[in-house]
Amino acid sequence: MRSKAARQKSLDFDQRGSRSSPHGFRLWRLIALGAALLLGVLTYFAGLDSLQIPKNGDEFPYAHIARLTAESGHWLPLQSTLDNMRNTKPPMLFWQGILSTHWGQDWTLWQLRYPNVLYTLATALLVGLLGWKCSHRHIATGLLAATLWLAFFSTYRFGRPFLTNAGEVFWLFLPFFLLLYRGKPGVDSPWGVPLFIGLCTGIGLLYKSFALLLPVGLGLAFWYWRYRHFRPGEFLKRDVVKLILIALISLGVFALWFALDPDPQSIWNEFVIGENAGKFDPHGPSYLSKMFWGDGSIWVLATGYALNAGLLALVVFAVMGHGLWRAIRLRDLSDDEKFLWWWVLILFLVFCFPSQRSSRYLLEAMPALAVLMALVWFRLSRWVLFVTTLLCTLAIGIIGYLGWLLQHDVGQQIYSGTDAVLLVIMLAVLVLSLLIPKLLPWLTLPGVFAAYLTLTGFLGVFDGPMGRYSTRTQNQVAGQTVWVPYSFNAAYEQYRFLLPGAQIRGYRSDAGIPLHILRERYPLLIIQEPLNAADCTDCKILGERLDLKGRQSDEEIRAMVHGDVARHLFLRERLIDNRHDPR
């Protein structure tokens, strides 16, 4: 057994610079970390109503379902015009969207997304409190843990859009937070804590899937067993009934969907069989070959935590290596750290078995990873932080270069001098931190947020006058049917935010239909062209805007790598009126 002094040392993220430090230095450190956390919070609200924020393609199908369900005037059944996508997810996210948009009356991206940002910030609060508790109540560690959680790219990408992840992560991390934060009283609670955990887990399942009960249940079971020092008899006597209660309550909450929906058979066919059982179908090669080879293998999933961290990927690898060294050689991991590492490992092992493997499935353990990183942040090699800060600097420089390319191709000033000055200041501060290694622990995370804000600034032009249709254009097509291009499920839903009041219909932009055929078919039509495309001389153009091309082919990516970036990244979109076309 390790001594109490060894446990104390392992829990303290920076024992030498904490209580032994002068009061002024401790205060300065709290101010610096608090400022970094505040910068992170502001970053999450910046550009929240943008169509271009980092996300994945599921946001618009989910918005489509929420909008049609709101228009129906009923909570259930869920509504959709998409084939086999009416019950693609449980109803909690869609109910959230219905409430936040006041039954679709305030249909804006901000209204759809802000509840998820609040969920993400609530998770940051849990992470901060856990960091504070695990470090023997060091406020600095709590601030650092919350900031790290917000700095993960997976949090930024999936914790802001109208997706299931923000609510799912909050509710499914809350049980682990409660057990670790309360300690023995929470574990020994006969029914109060298990009841609360069951309710939390059930709500989390209503955001994503009943299948998540498996990793959560295994994680909780292992934690209870670990609290009993791996004594099977005591575990069976004191905790198995609690785990059964948690499972029954959580499944009971999830079963409300079946009980309240007038068409439960469709839920079974579309969600249980199609959405969940289908994840064990290898869709091509055999199950085992896909498990061990290809881009969906377990080896790719093993990099999932680092991929989720984004610019902090190297830090994740360093923390994992450091944790492994301490577990095997030093044997000085605290009990709190062991519990968190076990949850990180259990979630990875569970999601090795479905044939569809993605780093997105590991999001529930990212809060635990943020706490673990905060506990050792100031013990990391300066080279790890140096490379991470260098990556942030390069990312900001590349985004600035893309902005210059766009402005050059458009042929007019679209970014202000203030934007350029702020860009130079951010780069100068990061370069200074690279030259003065002592600054790295304090400026690496602000550097990550600076990269996110630079991306927001670059994308801002697509949400300004040049990236939106004018009010005059919107009024001209209000109440009219406008045919818009799309290449992914329900991607046409975004045009309801660009042309509010218009009746939006989609056509496949990847079908290769010539322009003259499109003009014959559709009275009001939106087309997308490269910036350098020739003007349509006989077209009646009601409006146009700048846009980003969301998906590039392999050939286009190769061309971009060789320097032909603007032609394959930027688009000009035109709204054409064919209603009086003499042809």
Description of each model-found segment:
Residues 11, 132-136, 175-194, 204, ...:
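Membrane-interface transmembrane helices that cradle and orient dolichyl/undecaprenyl
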Residues 28-59, 226, 246-262:
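Transmembrane signal-anchor helices characteristic of membrane glycosylation enzymes that use polyprenol
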Residues 36, 127-151, 338:
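Transmembrane-helix signature of polytopic, membrane-embedded enzymes
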Residues 43-47, 61-85, 92-95, 99-102, ...:
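Extracytosolic helix-loop segments that constitute the early lumenal/periplasmic catalytic or substrate-binding loops
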Residues 62-68, 157, 199-203, 207, ...:
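Transmembrane-lumen/periplasm boundary regions of multi-pass, lipid-linked membrane glycan transferases
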Residues 112-113, 157-168, 358:
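Short acidic/glycine- and proline-prone juxtamembrane loop motifs at membrane-interface regions
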Residues 114-136, 174:
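Transmembrane-helix motifs of polytopic, lipid-linked glycan transferases
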Residues 195, 323-506, 531, 537-538, ...:
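Membrane-embedded architecture of ER/inner-membrane glycosylation machinery
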